[in-house]
Amino acid sequence: MGVGRFVYTPILPLMHAQAGLSAGAGADLATANYVGYLIGALAGTFVPRLVGSSIVLRSSLLALVASLAGMALTQSTAVWLLLRLGAGAFSAMIFVIAVSALLSHLREHPAHLPGWAFGGVGAGIALSGLLVLVLRTVGTWRSAWWASAVLAVLLTSAAWGLRPEPAVRRAPTASGAEPRSSGARNHRWFSALFASYTLEGIGYIIAGTFLVAAINQTLPGSIGSGAWVLVGLAAIPSSAFWAGLGRRWSRPDLLLAALGVQAVGIALPALAGGVAAALISAVLFGATFIGVSTLALGAGAHLRFPRAVALLTAGYSVGQILGPLVASPLLRHGYHQALLLSAGVVLAAALAAFLLRIGFPHAAPEGTERAGGDHRTAPGVVLPTGSGSPPSPGCSAEA
């Protein structure tokens, strides 16, 4: 999933230079991928039988490999749009099924272990970035897509034996209704959290799509590709790291801190320039984008707001679709303005997180059922990971 979803970022500059892809078309391809991801995530959420099917998992893995290879076979933007749409949908299905299997098979293991498992997304980012870093001097944009497909085949063979958890129908409450939240104050906290997480979806995805291209504007191409490898390496331990901090500090405080750090990291290449700024930016971004999801989804589950994780994931996914569209008009002037816009949106998310801190109930709100059930199909980069949140051991809170 890390390869299929994120390899486009380091290949994008090669497609600009060698395939004649315009900046606007590049943003459209990114949007298509995020639309596909939302479609796949919704399918996994509302058709639970898909989540428990080994056939669906294996079909999605093979289809994702085919979508990567297909990118090298054409120069038609329309076909590319369809392929990236499919890659997004297949990535989401793989992720949702992997979450289900993870919760099933690691339920009795230490709570931090799922956090490390979600580091696989970071590993996929790092491996695909390293692949493009090597190929940019000896290959072309086509060979980069072919190589990413080969890498995906190798990872598919490793994941082939994964056993999804069979779908289980949730028992209704005594009244047959959805669990209710405890009142207006709970709605206020959830509204602030929803706004923060949706804004994060917009802001993070602009950087996640264009960071390498922005760095390559003023530095050698190898620096941009190397920075993307650092993003992946920093992402590997990030979920477990933020989950560990969550045992000492409140999620709203950590969410505010993570968003602030992320905004600084995103803005650095546009404000400072230079190799050091690019590499520091990559580390700060990689260390926070999965952690923010961990903290936000954990806070939503803690509030026990009905369908909290599903609603948060939907807002985040819509934000990811809007991000490239919002940034697209700025791309004619290069990518630095897009990064500044991204940082500004993430700062707005931090402001909403600051409002969330006011009166946030550190004990679970009274009069509510557990908000479990949502987390198992929470799609996000949205990556549910170990944070010790109520619904499941180490997983309903994930980025």
Where are each of the predicted segments found?
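A late C-terminal transmembrane helix in Major Facilitator Superfamily
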Residues: L303-Y335, S342
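Conserved MFS/SLC helix-loop-helix module at the cytosolic interface between two early adjacent transmembrane helices
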Residues: I39-Q75
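C-terminal transmembrane helical hairpin of 12-TM major facilitator-type secondary transporters
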Residues: S250-A296
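Helix-to-loop junctions at the C-terminal end of transmembrane segments
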Residues: G40-S53, S238-R251, L331
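Cytoplasmic helix-loop-helix junction between adjacent transmembrane helices
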Residues: L83-V121
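Extracytoplasmic gate region of multi-pass secondary transporters
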Residues: T9, R188-V229, I236-P237
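Helix-loop-helix hairpin linking two adjacent transmembrane segments in secondary transporters
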Residues: T77, H109, G115-P164
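Helix-breaking motifs and short loop linkers at transmembrane-helix boundaries and internal kinks
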Residues: G20, G52, L73-A78, R107, ...
